[in-house]
Structures are given as structure tokens and as C-alpha cells.
UniProtKB/Swiss-Prot annotation:
Top-level taxonomy: Eukaryota, Metazoa, Chordata, Craniata, Vertebrata
Protein name according to UniProt: Cadherin-2
InterPro entries with a match to the protein in the record: Cadherin, Cadherin-like_dom, Cadherin-like_sf, Cadherin_CS, Cadherin_pro_dom, Cadherin_Y-type_LIR, Catenin-bd_sf
Stretches for region Disordered: 863-884
Primary subcellular site in the record, as a coarse category: membrane
Segments on the Extracellular face: 160-724
């Protein structure tokens, strides 16, 4: 039986190839027919169709290849066809009977000829246990036969077989290993073959799931499979001889893991949150809950269905919401959502696989919390019909009245926040209403000054609204409008000048006492009987005065346009007007006097200093004129030289270049270097003209080849004369003398320090300072000593050269003084050690001076000592005569010890 099946598998591809060749041959002979080659196109789909999913391709035969065809679907809301004939889903929907069949139209653009074809959609069949068993009964897979050269003719080799997949259910209980199929080659009759499989699950991770008997070719599975981990295994079977040579081409073996319902649905979130506006109509979308199942989504094991288990609270209806059992969309099914009554609903949602079968399906639950959001279904209402307030005149940013409202909507939301609008009583826009964000009150504020003399009272009409419009069907009640009565309080206002500033035109040069104008102010308080007095506030040049009663302005000095206080021909003066109200108020006004120019300033030469060479060439001096007046009292100017002194015109000449410039040149061939003052007559063009003799200071200097003054001349020209140079030298000499005197003083001071003696005068008793050696406790008894003697002990002179009058006060010994070797001088006489050595030397030479031997007891250890005479003690090395003559060098204090060991009489 297995061999017959193998033969059929071998013949089937051959028959299919022959059939295809015959069809192609017949097609070439048959005539081409324009239109759809099929009457009905079929497609097998899963239950759910997704948006944009390609379904099938309808073929249209276009014989001449030049016709342009447009496709159209009979169900354009669900299906569309592109220009290549590919049919796509327009939207996502579950496949049902109403979508099972539709038409596709093809219309030619030129002739408008139209064709149609039917499309039939069917559901993909679900695998059952019987089909799984049937697929599992495949017992033997035979390697396809290979053809080769035979009888000298080259025959076509047949293609490899396509082995049908092996379907194996997951979670099988065994026993293991469980045999699946037997793989063999029909060449096993003549050869001893060995079989093996490769691929993931065999020799690749995860390894060891599938094994094969190398002798019999029996393929087995070693443990249960999990489709959620690996849904398909792709193995390759091999057949080799005992030498390892390949006998057959490898074949592909596909093992499909059949899904079992072993996974519960799992919600993406355990708690879902959604919102719905209050007052929503039935059918309003709320939210979508989603659960996933790890099982095959194309099988019943992964097809989920949703339902609502419970709703809390159950008012106003226990079924306020429903859920789409396939998509999980939650919508409203009843009216009556009111946030002011119920603000939140809690739903328990269940998801069940096996298309919701309560008997075989697995279930899981989640919680959906639906919050009822507020809409503007409650308008704001004023707490009173009329509000009152008052404001002083001319005040801005003042709160006049506080408007209060009530609103039942959710606080601090656009449906609760109030917006106030003035609908009447304020045509000029002097008031505004701002909303307090915390209390929702309306604050009536003055934004423009109010004049009591113009308006004494305002009656405003105010309307209250929300930031968002009211819900449909809700109207504003009369309580949403109120009246605000505002009373204006009269206050004393500032007097004001009109016009301000006031501009007048006057010629400069007016004499003192001239009345210029009257500058008066007005009092806006018409209902107050008040007097105004005037004072001068600012008069930079002190030219004016004002009458305190009538405001007449009179000059007290000559007006000068050229004054630095005049800017752009205008002089500014400020005056103050004050009333006698309570409290008194004042206002300022500015008087601007535009001064007309008169010819009161004579021109001056510019520049006032210049330099030129001793010879006329190559330099000339260009000059101009400076006139503080303006046209026509300024240029053009006339330049000339005076007749006196005669040397001016003899040495110089002036040439007028234009109305503003002239040129001064040397008239003689050589002029000695020096400073010359050249008078120049300059006349302006005023009426009458004004002349002036202006002095030009000219420096004549020696010039180089470029016509520039040399450095010596520039130094002279800079004003550094002989006197200045002498003064500088004297300062330098004095400074050097001071430095020299300081150096001499420092040298003398050092010599005085060196001349000081370490031992002071006889009348000063210093024995405590230099002869007390054994003091170890307490501080110094004598603090009165010269510290410099310790710092500079090198100034102490030897005894042989002590000056007369300085001697020791110690008592001289009664016997002759011994002679001691003179110690070498210290290498550093400035050290304090030299000071101590000198004192020690003096003490050694005078043994009778204190401290005395009877007082310097260093080895007293207390009475009652058991030790005998120290002369009886011998050292460890006293084995013979030793030389103790060196004790004589230790001084008179060790004389007795030297006599004891040296053999003296004592």
C-alpha cells in the first residue's frame, strides 16, 4: 500500500506538467477573447478581514494590449480593485454571509464597454481532531526517484517532490518517543543506508526534540510541543551510505504544531479607564477593551468574545452600557447619564475564547471604570439682581463691585468658569469685569478715568456665561443677568495748563522787564470755588518771572539764543499752578520760547593755532571763521589783514578761497622760526555786519623734506622750555640726595650697634643675668636687660681690650689665678653660643666669684647614704696607672678632683 502511494506521488507532478503543457498549447491555437477568463473567482479567508488586506487577483484578458480598463466593485464600502486587478478590503470586518459574494466590473475608457465577474469568499476550514488524526497517519516518506543518462540519451530529471506537512498536536501526553513517520529511500534494497535529520529541533537549538532511527528511518518526537513557542519546525532528511556518501538529495519535512486551547485570554490592562459626557445619547462610543489569547487567532482557541458581567451603580438603569462581543467596544444603550447624580460607573468585563462558548471556552475578567464627564447643562446664576459700588473720579484699576454667581457644574472646569460681559450702560468702555479663578466671582474694575463733572453715576447691565456654550436644549434663565449701579465720587483734581506746552516766538536780546505772555491754568473742579496761584518751577538761565495771580511772564535778564541752556533755538521753562483745595493739587506747564537770532556775535578765526615752515613753500595755512549766530547773520565771511603793525602785511598775505575759507601764506622768502601772533579781520554777512580782529597763533619751524616740523621744533612747540628742564633736573638731584642720606644713616646705625658692649657700666649689677646657670624653675628674676646684647653678641670685646671704666664686680680670688689655654674664636661670632662661651671663660678665670663651690652641690642624694668614700670606687678598666692630668684643664672647680687623682698635696 505504501509503495502504491509513493508511485502516485511520483506520477502526480508529471501529470500536472503534461496538463499545463496541453493547456498552453491549446491557448496558443485558440482565439483571444476580451473579458474575464473566469465566471467566478473564489478566495478562502479567515473569519476576520483587515483593512487594506489583499484578497485575490482577478485577471482581465486584454487581447490588443492597448485598452485601458477601469475596475469597480459592487460593494465599494467593503472592497476596492486597483488597476492591476488586485482586490483589497476597504475596512476591517468579520466575514459573514452578506460579504460572501459580490461583483467586479471592468469598463473600457474609450468604448465604455463593460464586463463583470462574480467573486465568492469562503471561510477557511478549522482543523478538527479527526483531521489531525488523519494527517498524523502519514506513515512513510520516500525519497523521490532521480533520473539520469540512459541508453545514450539525455532524459529530463524530474523535480523533487513537495512533501506534505506533518500535523502534530501540542501538549501531547505521549508515550515518548512518539513515532511520526518513516523516511526511506527505494535504494535501500541494494545499499545499506543511514538516515538523519537536520534543522531547528533536531541538531540545532532547541536540539533533541526530533530524533530519527539511522537504520530504519523512523522519525519520532521526544517530548510535548508548545505551539506558542514554536508553531512550525522545518527539518531536512538525509540518506547516505555506510561510507557517508550522499545517496539521495535532502528532502524538506515541515511539522506543523496544531494548536490546543491551553491559554486563557489576558487583558492588556487589568483596569481600563474611559469617559463619557453626561446626557449622551444611546449608541455613544465610550471605550474599547482588548484581550489577547496566545492560542492560534485563526482557530476557535484564539477567537475571543466579550460580555459585561456587572455594572455598579445600577442607577438609573442596570444596563446603561453594552459591549461589542467581538471588538470590545463599549457603548451606551440607555439615556439618563447625569454627572450631578452618578459620577462614575464600574463594569466587570469578561473575555472568553472558543467564540465565547461557556462550556469549553476559557475566560478572564477585567474592570472598566467609566467616568461621566461634565457638560455645560447648568448656566451661572447671579445671587442678586442688583449690585452696588462707588469709585473716586480719575481712578483706574479700582474694583468697584464684586459679582457673585452659582453654578451646579463641576467646579474649575470650562462648564463652571464664568465669563462676565457688560451688555449695556458703558458705551465708552470705562469698565471691565475680570473673573476670580478661585471663587468664580466677577470683579468690576475701572479701566478708564471717570470725570465726576461729566458722569456722576453709571448703571451697567451685566450677563454671566460659561467658557463653553450651554448644552443643546438648555437656555439662559433671567438669573444670568444683573444690574450694577456705580456712583462716582468727586475729588479735587489737578489744575492744567492749556495748551501745554505753550510756544511763543521772540527775538533774542530783549531787555529785562519785557512782558512775554500770559500762561494760565484751568481748574477742572467746576463745583468747587478755588483759587489758583502760579510759581516758577524750572528756569535754567533765570531769565523769567511769573505773576502769582494772573500768570503774566516777564523777563528779568537778556535773552540770549547762544546760551548753552537753549537747545535748537528753544528755551524751556516750567511753571507750577496750585489750587487751595483739600488736599491742595497742582499742575505743571511748560513754556517754550523760540528765540529768533540777531547779529550779536562777531566771527572768530578757526583754528586759533597753526604751524608752517620758515619758507613759503610748500606749506600754507587754511583758516575759516566761527560764528555763533546762524544764517543770515553768519557766513559768507570776509578775511583781511590789518594795516597795523606794518610787519603783518609785510610778512603775510591772505587769500579768500570762498565764503567760509581763506588761506594764509608767508609773503617773504624766509621767516625765522618762532611763535607769531597774526591778527586777522573777519566780517560776517549780518545786517548790519559785525567785524572782529581775531588772533591766529602761528608757529614757524624748521621743516624736513616733506614739509613737516622736526622733533626739536615740536618739543619747543610743546612748551617744554629751559625752566621746565631745569626744574626736572633739580627734582632728580634732590631725590638722589635723599637716597644717599638714607644709606649713610643706615651705615651709621650699624656701626653704633657694633660699638655697644656686651657688659654694661659698673653701676649696673648684671651678675644675675650672666652668672646664674643652675636656675631651672620659674621665670627670669631679672627682666631688665638689653635684648640686643643677646642678638648681637659678636660685639663683645676680649678682656685684654676692654675699655676703661667697664669691669666686673665679682670678688677676686686670694690666690694666684691659674693660666688656661686660650680657646679659639668661634667661627661665627654672631652666634649666641659665643656669648655663653665668653661668660664661661670669665667665670673660669675668677673661681672666687659666685656661684661658689659650697653652694653648687650637684651630687647630693640625701643623708644616710650607705656608700663610702668615692675614692674607693674603681672603674672596670682600672688595672694600672692612668693619666688624670687632663683634669687640670677643666678649670678651678675641678682642681680638688685633679689633686686627688693627680697626686697633689691637697
Amino acid at each position: 500500500m505504501c509503495r502504491i502511494a509513493g508511485a502516485l506521488r511520483t506520477l502526480l507532478p508529471l501529470l500536472a506538467a503534461l496538463l499545463q503543457a496541453s493547456v498552453e498549447a491549446s491557448g496558443e491555437i485558440a482565439l483571444c477573447k476580451t473579458g474575464f477568463p473566469e465566471d467566478v473567482y473564489s478566495a478562502v479567508l479567515s473569519k476576520d478581514v483587515h483593512e487594506g488586506q489583499p484578497l485575490l487577483n482577478v485577471k482581465f484578458s486584454n487581447c490588443n494590449g492597448k485598452r485601458k480598463v477601469q475596475y469597480e466593485s459592487s460593494e465599494p464600502a467593503d472592497f476596492k480593485v486597483d488597476e492591476d486587478g488586485m482586490v483589497y478590503a476597504v475596512r476591517s470586518f468579520p466575514l459573514s454571509s452578506e460579504h460572501a459574494k459580490f461583483l467586479i466590473y471592468a469598463q473600457e475608457e474609450e468604448t465604455q464597454e463593460k464586463w463583470q465577474v462574480a467573486v465568492k469568499l469562503s471561510l477557511k476550514p478549522t482543523l478538527t481532531e479527526e483531521s489531525v488524526k488523519e494527517s498524523a497517519e502519514v506513515e512513510e516518506i520516500v525519497f523521490p526517484r532521480q533520473f539520469s543518462k540512459h541508453s545514450g540519451h539525455l532524459q529530463r530529471q524530474k523535480r523533487d517532490w513537495v512533501i506534505p506537512p506533518i500535523n502534530l498536536p501540542e501538549n501531547s501526553r505521549g508515550p515518548f518517543p512518539q513515532e511520526l513517520v518513516r523516511i526511506r529511500s527505494d535504494r535501500d534494497k541494494n545499499l545499506s543506508l543511514r538516515y538523519s535529520v537536520t534543522g531547528p529541533g533536531a541538531d540545532q537549538p532547541p536540539t533533541g526534540i526530533f530524533i530519527i532511527n539511522p537504520i530504519s528511518g523512523q522519525l519520532s518526537v521526544t517530548k510535548p510541543l508548545d505551539r506558542e513557542q514554536i508553531a512550525r519546525f522545518h527539518l531536512r532528511a538525509h540518506a547516505v551510505d555506510i561510507n557517508g556518501n550522499q545517496v539521495e538529495n535532502p528532502i524538506d519535512i515541515v511539522i506543523n504544531v496544531i494548536d490546543m486551547n491551553d491559554n486563557r485570554p489576558e487583558f492588556l490592562h487589568q483596569v481600563w479607564n474611559g469617559t463619557v459626557p453626561e446626557g449622551s445619547k444611546p449608541g455613544t462610543y465610550v471605550m474599547t477593551v482588548t484581550a489577547i489569547d496566545a492560542d492560534d487567532p485563526n482557530a476557535l482557541n484564539g477567537m475571543l468574545r466579550y460580555r459585561i458581567l456587572s455594572q455598579a451603580p445600577s442607577t438609573p438603569s442596570p444596563n446603561m452600557f453594552t459591549i461589542n462581543n467581538e471588538t470590545g467596544d463599549i457603548i451606551t444603550v440607555a439615556a439618563g447619564l447625569d454627572r450631578e447624580k452618578v459620577q462614575q460607573y464600574t463594569l466587570i468585563i469578561q473575555a472568553t475564547d472558543m467564540e465565547g462558548n461557556p462550556t469549553y471556552g476559557l475566560s478572564n475578567t477585567a474592570t472598566a471604570i467609566i467616568t461621566v464627564t461634565d457638560v455645560n447643562d447648568n448656566p451661572p446664576e447671579f445671587t442678586a439682581m442688583t449690585f452696588y459700588g462707588e469709585v473716586p473720579e480719575n481712578r483706574v484699576d479700582v474694583i468697584v463691585a464684586n459679582l457673585t454667581v452659582t453654578d451646579k457644574d463641576q467646579p474649575h472646569t470650562p462648564a463652571w468658569n464664568a465669563v462676565y460681559r457688560i451688555s449695556g450702560g458703558d458705551p465708552t468702555g470705562r469698565f471691565a469685569i475680570q473673573t476670580d479663578p478661585n471663587s468664580n466671582d466677577g470683579l468690576v474694575t475701572v479701566v478708564k478715568p471717570i470725570d465726576f463733572e461729566t458722569n456722576r453715576m453709571f448703571v451697567l447691565t451685566v450677563a454671566a456665561e460659561n467658557q463653553v456654550p450651554l448644552a443643546k436644549g438648555i437656555q439662559h434663565p433671567p438669573q444670568s443677568t444683573a444690574t450694577v449701579s456705580v456712583t462716582v465720587i468727586d475729588v479735587n483734581e489737578n489744575p492744567y495748563f492749556a495748551p501745554n506746552p505753550k510756544i511763543i516766538r521772540q527775538e533774542e536780546g530783549l531787555h529785562a522787564g519785557t512782558m512775554l505772555t500770559t500762561f494760565t491754568a484751568q481748574d477742572p473742579d467746576r463745583y468747587m470755588q478755588q483759587n489758583i496761584r502760579y510759581t516758577k518751577l524750572s528756569d535754567p538761565a533765570n531769565w523769567l518771572k511769573i505773576d502769582p495771580v494772573n500768570g503774566q511772564i516777564t523777563t528779568i535778564a537778556v535773552l540770549d539764543r547762544e546760551s548753552p541752556n537753549v537747545k535748537n533755538n528753544i528755551y524751556n521753562a516750567t511753571f507750577l499752578a496750585s489750587d487751595n483745595g483739600i488736599p491742595p493739587m497742582s499742575g505743571t506747564g511748560t513754556l517754550q520760547i523760540y528765540l529768533l537770532d540777531i547779529n550779536d556775535n562777531a566771527p572768530q578765526v578757526l583754528p586759533q593755532e597753526a604751524e608752517t615752515c620758515e619758507t613759503p613753500d610748500p606749506n600754507s595755512i587754511n583758516i575759516t571763521a566761527l560764528d555763533y549766530d546762524i544764517d543770515p547773520n553768519a557766513g559768507p565771511f570776509a578775511f583781511d589783514l590789518p594795516l597795523s603793525p606794518v610787519t603783518i602785511k609785510r610778512n603775510w598775505t591772505i587769500t579768500r578761497l570762498n565764503g567760509d575759507f581763506a588761506q594764509l601764506n608767508l609773503k617773504i622768502k624766509f621767516l625765522e622760526a618762532g611763535i607769531y601772533e597774526v591778527p586777522i579781520i573777519i566780517t560776517d554777512s549780518g545786517n548790519p555786519p559785525k567785524s572782529n580782529i581775531s588772533i591766529l597763533r602761528v608757529k614757524v619751524c624748521q621743516c624736513d623734506s616733506n614739509g613737516d616740523c622736526t622733533d626739536v621744533d615740536r618739543i619747543v612747540g610743546a612748551g617744554l622750555g629751559t625752566g621746565a628742564i631745569i626744574a626736572i633736573l633739580l627734582c632728580i638731584i634732590i631725590l638722589l640726595i635723599l637716597v644717599l642720606m638714607f644709606v649713610v644713616w643706615m651705615k651709621r646705625r650699624d656701626k653704633e650697634r657694633q660699638a655697644k658692649q656686651l657688659l654694661i657700666d659698673p653701676e649696673d649689677d648684671v651678675r644675675d643675668n650672666i652668672l646664674k646657670y643652675d636656675e631651672e624653675g620659674g621665670g627670669e628674676e631679672d627682666q631688665d636687660y638689653d635684648l640686643s646684647q643677646l642678638q648681637q653678641p659678636d660685639t663683645v670685646e676680649p678682656d685684654a681690650i676692654k675699655p676703661v671704666g667697664i669691669r666686673r664686680m665679682d670678688e677676686r680670688p686670694i690666690h694666684a689665678e691659674p693660666q688656661y689655654p686660650v680657646r679659639s674664636a668661634a667661627p661665627h661670632p654672631g652666634d649666641i653660643g659665643d656669648f655663653i662661651n665668653e661668660g664661661l671663660k670669665a667665670a673660669d678665670n675668677d673661681p672666687t666669684a659666685p656661684p661658689y663651690d659650697s653652694l653648687l652641690v650637684f651630687d647630693y642624694e640625701g643623708s644616710g647614704s650607705t656608700a663610702g668614700s668615692l675614692s674607693s670606687l674603681n672603674s672596670s678598666s682600672s688595672g694600672g696607672e692612668q693619666d688624670y692630668d687632663y683634669l687640670n684643664d677643666w678649670g678651678p672647680r675641678f682642681k680638688k678632683l685633679a689633686d686627688m687623682y693627680g697626686g697633689g698635696d691637697d
